[in-house]
UniProtKB/Swiss-Prot annotation:
One of its GO terms (molecular function) is L-ascorbic acid binding. Basement membrane-associated chondroitin sulfate proteoglycan (CSPG). Has prolyl 3-hydroxylase activity catalyzing the post-translational formation of 3-hydroxyproline in -Xaa-Pro-Gly- sequences in collagens, especially types IV and V. May be involved in the secretory pathway of cells. Has growth suppressive activity in fibroblasts. The gene is P3h1. It comes from Rattus norvegicus. It is found in: Endoplasmic reticulum; Secreted, Extracellular space, Extracellular matrix. TPR repeats lie at residues 25-58, 135-168, 197-230, 293-326. This is Prolyl 3-hydroxylase 1.
Length: 728
């Protein structure tokens, strides 16, 4: 932690202005808004830029001073006073102890006063601080920059404001307009207020979700390093004046030790809240859950996927510091240990900075819970990993009673709402069913394809199972293509699954298969068949769901999963856990957050099975709780499952416990802007390699009983949803 504190101090020194030449940001902001009102655009730029720099410089000054004074004047123990118990019998020694304690405190305060100087008087009001946090200066700046023809800066300011205010429709329109202007480049759309730790984390998670563990690792490691620096900065900035919460100072009355307690507990609570602050991003409604531990979760699996078992064990052990009873992580650790060897694995310890962080955090929580229990000063623990023994027994019982009361009231309200909903549903169900039936059940287009299960049979909406999409010979040829591509060195390289260490997978994308075919490493006709089959599935799904807008490929790959024989004993995990394809599923809260790193633009999904000669691997739909199974589908050659990608269709894949499961997984979007670039390249390559008659798919053959209105009993699909994992 010493190195981290030094890094925080050096960053603050670099960011701060020399000496005390820092203007008041509130005055500069006021001058900027006044300039905006009179149309003085250079004045807006001058004052708003200075206001932003001034606020940043004040923050850096406070951070530098508090870090430096804490380093130069630490709280040193009184080594020459003997054991603390002896102070009870020696009033003189106790008084001396107090004097030394307060002497250190006074010296720290004097250090801060000298360091901070006159700028310490610049305190923003709560309202103005909120304006800066909302990034309001950038709203003014983007207009002013545009007016004085500084387009690059206008774009950056607009983007910075929009990141913090994603619901601001006018700014969205401005950004759309900027995108159409000549001279505007993609790199101009940058967030000037981006936090390094969050930027690296989101980039690392995106690469991880795209199954690029080698590229993800450096960003996730950088995110961790930046996190600890940001944490030290946040904690140092908590040591400000006491917040009386409105007009409470008028009635505040406390003796010396109560006043010290109140202020210190407030500071500790602020420091604990850094967990929430650092896990927050302006574009998200809620902070990332278990933000710091999640870094180690991503890293342990990323390291595992690139074959670095030493680091995988270190990160797994670090994660288990926070969640020691996590069964999946314990299972992963046991697997890594078996591969690396018990002796070498036992010498690997959790990361030291994480151990220090956890130890310090638990000590702070103990004090805060003690203050909650004795003085009634509320403390809301931001972490889910806090051990129960840290909380005093009496407080545990009180919280348990409060939770039970809240649950009872919630259940009563819920029951009442269900009664009302049932009445409403009964009134609307009939009309809804008719509406769904009129949408789902379009022609299947090709002879031989049969409708096996519709939404009604699958107990949901916007779901379908079809058989006969391809023949047995085509299934076998595509399976051979996957294995041939794997041995030729494709993008997957025969790695273990990104979702479970108990399976290996081999896969190839359409473009990669065509390129391998062009190079003679796999049969070119097989690669062409793969291309045609994916287009066939796209057309069928588009027709069956009666979509008014064309479906575009978002991502597609042919993948085979093989059970690792020695890893199947007492296996409890899934081949792919329950998820949603275009949002991040929080099963406990029954919500799905549609924001990055989820692939929010995905609208429909499909999976075409190539075989069924394996154990396990069944596909299943669930409710939002990820536990209540609503339908299950057993794979077989030529069987396709299609569904909308939204919250109405959470799904997962059961563990493959024997053999190899092969399938083509496809995701589609209704937005052409998110059409897969690889697909466009694949289209061009097919046109170059094959004659026009070879490129065309077999003639679509509408079947008489599949045209017109759907048959009674057929239902439709409605919404869409998804998750940041390219697996079905």
């Amino acid at each position: 932690m010493v190195a981290v504190a030094a890094a925080a101090a050096s960053r603050a020194t670099a960011e701060s202005e020399p000496e005390w030449n820092v203007a008041a940001p509130d005055l500069l902001y006021a001058e900027g808004t006044a300039a905006y009102a009179r149309g003085d655009w250079p004045g807006v730029v001058l004052n708003m830029e200075r206001a932003l720099r001034s606020r940043a410089a004040l923050r850096a000054l406070r951070l530098r001073c508090r870090t430096r004074c804490a380093t130069e004047l630490p709280w040193a123990p009184d080594l020459d006073l003997g054991p603390a118990s002896s102070l009870n019998h020696d009033p003189g020694a106790a008084a001396l102890h107090d004097l030394r304690f307060f002497g250190a405190l006074l010296r720290r305060a004097a250090c801060l006063r000298r360091c901070l100087g006159p700028p310490s008087a610049h305190l923003l009001s709560e309202e103005l601080d909120l304006e800066f946090n909302k990034r309001s200066p950038y709203n003014y700046l983007q207009v002013a920059y545009f007016k004085i023809n500084k387009l690059e800066k206008a774009v950056a300011a607009a983007h910075t404001f929009f990141v913090g205010n994603p619901e601001h429709m006018e700014m969205r329109q401005n950004l759309d307009y900027y995108q159409t202007m000549s001279g505007v480049k993609e790199e101009d759309f940058k967030d000037l207020e981006a936090k390094p730790h969050m930027h690296e984390f989101r980039l690392g998670v995106r690469l991880y979700s795209e199954e690029k563990p080698l590229e993800a690792v450096p960003h996730l490691e950088a995110a961790l390093q930046e996190y600890f620096v940001a944490d030290e900065e946040c904690r140092a900035l908590c040591e400000g004046p006491y917040d009386y919460d409105g007009y409470n100072y008028l009635d505040y009355s406390a003796d010396l030790f109560q006043a010290i307690t109140d202020h210190y507990v407030q500071v500790l609570s602020c420091k604990q809240n850094c967990v929430t602050e650092l896990a927050s991003h302006p574009s998200r409604e809620k902070p990332f859950e278990d933000f710091l531990p999640s870094h180690y979760n991503y890293l342990q699996f990323a390291y595992y996927n690139i074959g670095n078992y030493t680091q995988a064990i270190e990160c797994a052990k670090t994660y288990l510091l926070f969640f020691p009873n996590d069964e999946v992580m314990s299972q992963n650790l046991a697997y890594y240990t078996a591969v690396l060897g018990e002796e070498e694995a036992s010498s690997i310890s959790p990361r030291e900075n994480a151990q220090e962080y956890r130890h310090r955090s638990l000590l702070e929580k103990e004090l805060l819970f003690f203050a909650y229990d004795i003085f009634g000063i509320p403390f809301v623990d931001p972490d889910s990993w806090t051990p129960e023994e840290v909380i005093p027994k009496r407080l545990q019982e009180k919280q348990k009673s409060e939770r039970e009361t809240a649950v009872r009231i919630s259940q009563e309200i819920g029951n009442l709402m269900k009664e009302i909903e049932t009445l409403v549903e009964e009134k609307t169900k009939e009309s809804l069913d008719v509406s769904r039936l009129t949408r789902e059940g379009g022609p299947l287009l090709y002879e031989g394809i049969n409708l096996t299960m519709n939404s009604k049979v699958l107990n949901g909406s916007q779901r379908v199972v079809m058989d006969g999409v391809i023949s047995d010979d085509e299934c076998q040829e595509l399976q051979r293509l996957t294995n041939a591509a794997a041995t030729s060195g494709d993008g997957y390289r025969g790695q273990t699954s990104p979702h479970t260490p108990n399976e290996k997978f081999y896969g190839v994308t359409v473009l990669k298969a065509l390129k391998l075919g062009q190079e003679g490493k796999v049969p070119l006709q097989s690669a062409h068949m793969y291309y045609n089959v994916t287009e066939k599935v796209r057309r069928v799904m588009e027709s069956y769901f009666r979509l008014d807008t064309p479906l575009y490929f978002s991502y597609s790959h042919l993948v085979c999963r093989t059970a690792i024989e020695e890893s199947q004993a007492e296996r409890k995990d899934s081949s792919h856990p329950v998820h949603v394809d275009n949002c991040i599923l929080n099963a406990e809260s029954l919500v799905c957050i549609k924001e990055p790193p989820a692939y929010t633009f995905r609208d429909y999904s499909a999976i075409l099975y190539l075989n069924g000669d394996f154990d396990g691997g069944n596909f299943y739909f669930t409710e939002l709780d990820a536990k209540t199974v609503t339908a299950e589908v057993q794979p077989q050659c030529g069987r396709a499952v299609g569904f909308s990608s939204g919250t109405e269709n959470p799904h997962g894949v059961k563990a493959v416990t024997r053999g190899q499961r092969c399938a083509i997984a496809l995701w589609f979007t209704l937005d052409p802007r998110h059409s897969e670039r690889d697909r466009v390249q694949a289209d061009d390559l097919v046109k170059m390699l094959f004659s026009p008659e070879e490129v065309d798919l077999p003639q679509e053959q509408p079947l008489p009983d599949q045209q017109g209105s759907p048959k009674p009993g057929e239902e439709s699909l409605s919404d869409r949803e998804s998750q940041p994992k390219d697996e079905l």
